[in-house]
Amino acid sequence: MNNKQQIQKLRDNAELAMASYGYFHLIGKKFKNDSIYKGRENTEITLYDILDLTYKDYVTTDHTMLINPEYLNGDFTPTQAKRFFERYDLLIHQPNTESGFSATFFYNKESKEYTLAIRGTEFKLEQIKDLINDYYIGINNDNNGKTASKKKESY
């Protein structure tokens, strides 16, 4: 692989990593009915809208959390989002679980390759469990303070 191909591969992987943070569970919901949304009020949220930074911090109409409403958080330019989905299909998205796990499965239409993108820890108060789990995994302990090797010896 030459330098140009290697740089392209790194760019593709960085884009996939960024896209994995998209709130794809919001597809099909509607933008809040608010005039600040400039013609998008009460319209359906599309795949492209999720990643498009134009709609960053736009709130949905049917969010379920009063304190922390559902909002879009895209970081792609409109052109970048369009090109991304011309190249990749979103196959499956697992939104954050209680433990903080989230992953997205993409398919590259050109290379016919699959990519499983697993998101990292998000630092939100309601997801403190995720940080605690990461800590225990990092020190090789379970929640009771017993190391994995001690538990293994007890069997």
What are these regions (language model features)?
Residues 1-62:
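N-terminal low-complexity, Ser/Thr- and acidic-residue-enriched intrinsically disordered segments
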Residues 35, 45, 49-155:
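A conserved cap/lid and substrate-binding interface adjacent to the catalytic center
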